[in-house]
Amino acid sequence: AQTAKDWAAKGRIRFDRLPADDTAAWQERMTGADLIWLESPTNPLLSIADLTTLCRAERKSGSILVVDNTFLTPLRQQPLDLGADITMQSTTKFIGGHSDLLGGSLATRDQHLVDRLRTSRTLLGASPGALEVFLTLRGARTLALRVDTAESNAKELAAHLGNHPDVSTVRYPGLGSMISFDA
């Protein structure tokens, strides 16, 4: 976000930061944007964007909707199926799983975007090395087990803390108590 803020300060782009769960504000801004970048759930507060509505919302012709899906991984959320143009993942986090990898991935079903992204990657040199690919594959092999375990543990912890007298708020979408929760 800092790079976007710097570019905006120089007048190179317009940058608006919106609460993920403010669907009306997103819909209003989407009609004039060239690039819409959503993170859902957000890190660290776990706010949930209404991706189904936003992916179907009216947008400027030719605009690109990107969803940062790092937190849920492709195992729990598939933004392309909801209508996003691009989904991105940080392979550094859940997918890698061992804190020894720096990387990311982009996915799209739009061949024109694939070609543009491939050209950018080639020109900028943003291609992973053999070790990074190995580490990503190693992490991907255990991803389902780790996500299932983390989800189970988080749900149990959130339920316990939600009933604790010294805890005023628990932000965990899986409990259904958040305003932005969608069962």
Predicted regions and their residues:
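Conserved PLP-binding catalytic core of the aspartate aminotransferase-like
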Residues: 168-183
